[in-house]
Amino acid sequence: MSKASLSPNVEDLKKKQIRQYKEIIRISKAQSIRIKELQLENERLLSENIDLRTTAINLEEQLETVQNENEENKTKLAALLNRFHEETDNFLSKLSLCQQEIQDTFKPVEANLAYDVDTDSEDLDEESVVKDTEEIIEQAQHDVSLRNLSGIEDENIIDDGETAINEQKKREANVFSDTQSAPQLKSGKALPADFENPYNLSNSKPVNNNNEDRVEAVTSENKSIDSAPQEKNHEYEIVSPKSLSNKINNQAAAQRRTEEDNANGVAQEENEGSQEAHFHSRIQSDTVIQSTPTKRKWDVDIQNKQINLASAATNVTGYVSETDSRPNRANSLDSAVLLVQSSNKSNRNGHHISDPNLNSSISLKFAPEDTAHNSLTSQENVGPQVTTTSLSNMTVAESPRTDTPREINGLVDSSVTNGNEKFSVEIMNDSNKIGLNPKSFTDEEREILTLFRNPPMRLSSEPPSSNGFSIAHPNNSPLRPPSLQGILNAEDRPYEIEPSRSSFATNDTGSYNNLELLSSVTNLKSPNENDRVTKTQSRRETKVKRRRKARIQETSEESTVVNEPNEKPDGRSRRERKKVNYALPGLRTKLRRNFDLPSDHVKAKKTRRAPKNSENDSATKTETANITSEAPTTSEVTLENSETLNL
């Protein structure tokens, strides 16, 4: 009974618990649903909050912008008000001024006249004195400036008073009122009769006749100018000091130009006849120019030098002839010919030179080094005395007649003949570095150059040339510096550069023995030995090492002595030899086997020594092999075990 009574109670309890669990599950589901709803509501509220915040922020920004606009409008209004007040004040002030002007204009005239008449007589006297003194000072300053600028000192200005001042103004106006003097001088027309020439301008025009006709024309024109009547009752303008100085400078420049034009025209027209007679033996062109790849310092301004040379020759001989005026005539000066026609009949001043001792043989020398620009100095002497004309970097020397050409240090070859009256300068062709002529050297210079050609023998301690090629000369002379080849080999043919040979080929005579000395110190092999010896030696070494592995220690030592004939017993250990060899520079390379050293510096691999009781070891090996062959395999053991389990 007890068991039957207990069983329903347990079942009831189980049912109650199941009900409670179901209720709890239902409540939890409802709560979870409620929680989800609350979460959704919370999210919605958060989103609304965010929207409200953004709108609030936008409203605040708008409010700030509106406030700023209001402030700007206030400032603008204040500025407009201030401007309006200022304009109103100005308008009122103008109105007041207009009222005052109207009142002033309608005042009676008698009051003004009375005010003007009421002046003190003493004040009038003082003002007149001051004005008079100022006028006197201004007039004096004007007179002094005119006298200083014109350069004319006239005593009548001080003595005669107003008449002298009028005459001075008249002269200045005659000189500077019209600029007709320069064109009249150039064209050769006669000057006006009232023109005065205080600066002694040359009024002569170029004349085609002799010097006497030219002088007569000049004197006749001067007489006509001086004899012309002068008008005195003209009115002249007062010229300022600045314009006066400018006119004076222009007049002086015009005077210089006219004088130069007249002189050049007279010289050209006087020498026209002699020019046609002496130009039949002329060379094709005045200057023959050959371009070179290199330019020296004195080749840069050669055109100016040629022009200056021509002007210098005119001072010595009288005339320069030039026909070729092309722009590219003076690009370089490696070889050039300058022809200067000289005339002994008349010089620039019209004087005749009839001395037979004076010839036109002229030598020219160009100095390549940079010298100071010397002024043009010309000296003309009659007789065998040499006259020189130096211009910048050039020297023109006049010497007596010589039939043979002159050579100045191999630079210039000049030849002039008196019959043709020709001045020619030939600059030698620059075929080598500097264009020196070997025939022009003196004995001392040739001795020095022979030393350069055949230098003393090289000592045995000097290293050979490290170039990849050797230079062979027909005379078997030693190597020369390349900068002197153009000077030393002007007569001989140039060097023949052979294809590259080894630097040892030049040392066949044994004069240089440093390589043998180095090989004796470092036990180097001679370079003439073949590489096959080194290969065979290395093969022998490898064979010896293989044999050492299979031999006993005693027999291996004997084999190393027998199979290495290059090894020399010098009583040193291998470590000592290694230290000596590695101490020398340049031995830690891949070509170490090329050295004539014993092979002991190569570290040999360690050989495994064979055991002394080799027979016992072989017996043990055979026993172990038999044991392994008799032992069953693992597969057989597993099969036996499975059979026993089944049983």
Curated annotation (Swiss-Prot):
Disulfide bonds: none annotated. Residues 28-87, 125-145 form a coiled coil. The lineage of its organism: Eukaryota, Fungi, Dikarya, Ascomycota, Taphrinomycotina. The modification Phosphoserine is found at S7, S240, S332, S335. Residues 200-210 have a biased composition (Low complexity). Its main location: nucleus. InterPro entries: Shugoshin1/2, Shugoshin_C, Shugoshin_N. It comes from Schizosaccharomyces pombe (strain 972 / ATCC 24843) (Fission yeast). One of its GO terms (cellular component) is chromosome, subtelomeric region. One of its GO terms (biological process) is mitotic sister chromatid biorientation. Keywords: Cell cycle, Cell division, Centromere, Chromosome, Chromosome partition, Coiled coil, Meiosis, Mitosis, Phosphoprotein. The modification Phosphothreonine is found at T292. Belongs to the shugoshin family. 'Shugoshin' means 'guardian spirit' in Japanese. It comes from the Eukaryota. This is Shugoshin-2. Involved in chromosome cohesion during mitosis and meiosis by preventing premature dissociation of cohesin complex from centromeres after prophase, when most of cohesin complex dissociates from chromosomes arms. Required for faithful mitotic chromosome segregation and proper kinetochore orientation during meiosis I. In contrast to sgo1, it is dispensable for centromeric protection of rec8 during meiosis I as well as protection of rad21 during mitosis. Required to sense the lack of tension at centromeres during mitosis. It is found in: Chromosome, Centromere.
